[in-house]
Design a protein with these regions (language model features):
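Partner-binding and oligomerization surfaces adjacent to conserved cores of proteins
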Residues: 1-205
Length: 205
């Protein structure tokens, strides 16, 4: 879909599997609750805000992650895009409608640690420590001011050639799948480097 339509999908934050997505830790929630005693709209805003924030999640790492292949792909078919923060920033300049923000996720203890709320993006840059393996960096867009009805997410224009540095193919994929990906990419007029993941390369013993 990304290659065919040259648009990047950002998922509505409250549709993520993690029910804590975009919420506050206990210490922060207690402070917000006190502040909202005389102003209920203050708390209501944060509850509804999640519906207007969309996110694209990326894994930041020097090396491939076997766990990420296992969790986010089905069977032996799937692709991983290699990029850099700089390339992502440049690629997003193509979209003139929405403003995107890029930030690295912090992993904290939601029962003990505090999440700042002086910026409306902060709740979306924190997750529970049990998600540390994701090493996530995010593209975040707030569409509140656009008065849009978003179902599952939003597609934004993106410079594909700038975004994608290399494509990795699932380590357990068959040759026919690799050839199919190469043919599709060529037909669409792209010349990305395409490699099969070496996580399943031949052992040396």
């Amino acid at each position: 879909d990304l290659l065919l339509y040259r648009k990047l999908f950002l998922s509505r934050s409250d549709k993520f599997e993690d029910q804590y997505e975009g919420t506050f830790s206990e210490p922060t929630f207690e402070e917000i609750r006190k502040l909202s005693i005389n102003n209920p709209a203050f708390l209501d805003y944060y509850k509804s805000h999640r519906e207007n924030v969309v996110i694209s999640s990326w894994h930041i790492n020097e090396y491939e992650s076997f766990a990420m292949w296992q969790i986010f792909t089905q069977k032996s078919e799937g692709l991983a895009i290699q990029s850099t923060v700089g390339r992502i920033q440049e690629a997003l300049h193509l979209d003139k409608t929405f403003e995107q923000h890029i930030g690295e996720v912090n992993y904290i203890d939601y029962k003990k640690e505090y999440i700042p709320f002086d910026n409306t993006f902060f709740p979306f840059l924190f997750k529970r420590k049990s998600f540390q393996y994701e090493r996530e960096i995010r593209i975040i867009t707030d569409v509140t001011s656009f008065d849009l009805k978003i179902d599952n997410g939003l597609k934004i224009d993106v410079d594909i050639n700038q975004l994608i540095e290399k494509i990795y193919i699932h380590p357990k994929s068959e040759n026919w799948y690799k050839n199919l990906v190469i043919e599709l990419v060529q037909r669409l007029g792209f010349d990305f480097k395409i490699e099969k993941s070496d996580l399943e390369s031949d052992i040396l013993i």
